[in-house]
Amino acid sequence: MAYCFKSNYTSDYNSGLRWHKRGIKKVSDSPGVREINMNLYDNKLYMEDINYVRSQNLPWGKLKNKSLLLSGATGMIGSFLVDVILEKNIIDGLNCTVYGLGRSEEKAKARFGKYADDPRFVFIPYDVKLPLKRNDLGTVDYVLHLASNTHPMQYSTDPIGTITTNIIGLQNMLDFAVEHHATRFAFASSNEVYGENRGDVEFFEEGYCGYINSNTLRAGYPESKRCGEALCQAYKAQKGLDIVIPRLTRTYGPTMLMSDTKAISQFIKKGIAGEDVVLKSAGNQYYSYQYVADSVAGVLTVLLCGESGEAYNIADENSDIMLRDLAAIIAKMNGKEVIFEIPDALEAAGYSTATKARLNGRKLRDLGWSSQYNIQCGIERTITILRSLQ
């Protein structure tokens, strides 16, 4: 049963991040930035979330004195995962070096200023659509490809970038993993690979294949994720690369980007602002959701415990909900109402056409993972934490 996790954990560590580029000012040297940067780490609920994942019963020894490289380090999943590993280093002596890849130096400085002087964290400015040639890194033990265009507006405004990040970007990361003799490669895939429910199942298991109309703009994201999974299997067969595939469902949490245009993110932003929640459909969509802490725990479980070549759904039915009910929960929390609005053509072009996408998480639970935050608790924590940063 999912529940709202409680802990008395706090962290007093106050360090910071070295940059793989000469001449970049540390975040502590930038007036007005450090206060914003430190707010998240000063939040008790956020540090409880980090501690919950840090304390998972996982074979952490596989990461001890090793190195981990991940793309999308400043994204919702990536930034949370970076915090978990670096706190694990500090508290439990994991001594895992993290190489974080991301396009925005400024975003990384604002997000990871706490680790500015930590030799076990290196941020590398990088666009995954370009080959990653870094001979100075030596052997990299684990590689995670998390970078992706993950919200609807990007699907319609940058359809080329959406596809190339998921295919060319993935290939660049796979090549890097092969060249640097990585022990394991994890490709963060998506619930969207399942397409539309044919009406024959209640939950998607990992072998399910639903309908996707490939001759549409919106098909770029799910089809490129499908292609990415096949590309991983090709590298496993031809290059001998050990790969695993965590399939993320609709993830939310306090590390979400304010630019995110997914429905749940829009609802949460309205909740933070204390405004009415805007629903741009009848709200009949029935989806799986997952709080970011549980999603990252799932990614780490797949990375450290998953069987080579296998895909795993990161989902729990206690967080499955219809979109209209999700909107109502957030509105009720803030004493507001749900109002209906017709989306413009650009917005509508990026929306998923799937009306029912519930994932079966049994395969991942068999590895020992379980969800700790149900949808009500996760939403409450997200809004509370993000409000504290205002």
Where do the protein language model's features map onto the residues?
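N-terminal Rossmann/SDR dinucleotide-binding element
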Residues: 34-142
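Conserved C-terminal active-site "lid" loop/helix of NAD(P)H-dependent oxidoreductases
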Residues: 292, 324, 347-370
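Conserved Rossmann-fold NAD(P)-dependent oxidoreductase catalytic core, especially the SDR/UDP-sugar
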Residues: 172-220
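Glycine-rich NAD(P)-binding loop of the Rossmann-fold in SDR/ketoreductase-type enzymes
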Residues: 161-169, 215, 219, 223-224
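NAD(P)H-binding glycine-rich loop region in Rossmannoid oxidoreductase-like domains
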Residues: 125-165
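Conserved beta-loop-beta element that borders a ligand/cofactor-binding pocket
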Residues: 190, 229-254, 265
